[in-house]
Amino acid sequence: MEKQIAVLPGDGIGPEVTDAAIEVLQAVADRFGHTFSYKKALLGGCAIDEVGTPLPEETLDVCRHADGILLGAVGGPKWDTLPGHLRPEKGLLGLRKGLNLFANLRPVTVYDSLADASTLKNDVIDGVDLLIVRELTGGLYFGEPRERRGEGETEEVVDTLLYTRGEMRRIIRKAFELAMVRNKHVTSVDKANVLESSRMWREVANEVAQEFPEVTLEHMLVDNAAMQLIRRPKQFDVLVTENLFGDILSDEASMVTGSLGMLPSASLTSDGPGLYEPIHGSAPDIAGKGVANPLATIASCAMMLKYSFGLHEEAKTIEDAIEAVLKQGYRTADIAKPGEESSSTKAITDAVVEAIQASVDIS
């Protein structure tokens, strides 16, 4: 199989973790007889510095012609004083909108060998395997008008939470489709006791549920969902929610695992390349030191192989390699115990590559 991958290293540790991920992808390609080609492009702060905009048109074009997109991280304090439309994060929002990446998938899995990294008790997190499906191109982050009006103490500010019924239906249906190949349980998260948009969301969820009689649908208010993710995360299979709620809940759920450095994500559309990225930030404080955790980016590559390329065995090979490396005791500083020796980005990447090369031939 031949595939072209757009690589957007971005800012901070982004170039380091994407380089590590490319090494792993190349090991998979060599191992299974595939050909992956890579084309790098600018996004975020580095794009602002070089061409004056966080999302150059050339980058959008490279992504549109790719089979999959790998992103490192964007942003950093260097660009925090810029106007909102010139911030690095605006480039990522524009990329999502430009490629119609409406479905964000955030898997949360607790590795047995990393159970101690979580601040929660082992009996609470043991066996956690949930998936948050977040709507990504609507809601408060994109709704108009978005403005300030008036001045002084009577100055008003307006943000708009806007969705169409169709936008709700496509993301909820995606959650049900994913639940069909998991444990057939969907928790729809809303604020239907207050928000009109949530009341319509709940209506649409009930309509979609009729198409999937094998799947159990549960409605949960967002404040309760936030509590339950910490209190009893094992109850969840697939959670689906709108943009703002999903942004908050997915970061909360990430701490069930103990480190943002372990969690991948996928942003998908109905027809076009998916975007795959770690959920951690650009971590400029450790950029260039060779200590960044590459495992979330590597795991994001496994999601690319699965969801964009249909290469499920290859994806599992990466996932198994990550598990094997953790069992061997490799740890970057973010997941190491106090006083425990930590591994470099290169050491962990090399170990994952070796584990892939040593895997049983299933091609």
Swiss-Prot record:
Entry annotated with the keyword Magnesium: yes
Source organism, top-level taxon: Bacteria
Protein's GO biological process: L-leucine biosynthetic process
Principal localisation: cytoplasm
Alphabetical keyword list: Amino-acid biosynthesis, Branched-chain amino acid biosynthesis, Cytoplasm, Leucine biosynthesis, Magnesium, Manganese, Metal-binding, NAD, Oxidoreductase
Residues that hold substrate according to the record: R96, R106, R134, D223
Annotated binding of Mg(2+), by residue: D223, D247, D251
InterPro entries: IsoCit/isopropylmalate_DH_CS (IPR019818), IsoPropMal-DH-like_dom (IPR024084), Isopropylmalate_DH (IPR004429)
Catalytic reaction(s) noted: (2R,3S)-3-isopropylmalate + NAD(+) = 4-methyl-2-oxopentanoate + CO2 + NADH
Record-level Gene Ontology MF annotations: 3-isopropylmalate dehydrogenase activity; magnesium ion binding; NAD binding
Cofactor remark from the record: Binds 1 Mg(2+) or Mn(2+) ion per subunit.
Annotated NAD(+) binding sites: 76-89, 281-293
Pathway recorded for this protein: Amino-acid biosynthesis; L-leucine biosynthesis; L-leucine from 3-methyl-2-oxobutanoate: step 3/4
Principal EC category: oxidoreductase
SUPFAM superfamilies reported for this sequence: Isocitrate/Isopropylmalate dehydrogenase-like
Known cofactor(s): Mg(2+); Mn(2+)
Subunit structure: Homodimer.
Reported function: Catalyzes the oxidation of 3-carboxy-2-hydroxy-4-methylpentanoate (3-isopropylmalate) to 3-carboxy-4-methyl-2-oxopentanoate. The product decarboxylates to 4-methyl-2 oxopentanoate.
Family: Belongs to the isocitrate and isopropylmalate dehydrogenases family. LeuB type 1 subfamily.
Protein name as annotated: 3-isopropylmalate dehydrogenase
Species: Halalkalibacterium halodurans (strain ATCC BAA-125 / DSM 18197 / FERM 7344 / JCM 9153 / C-125)
Gene: leuB
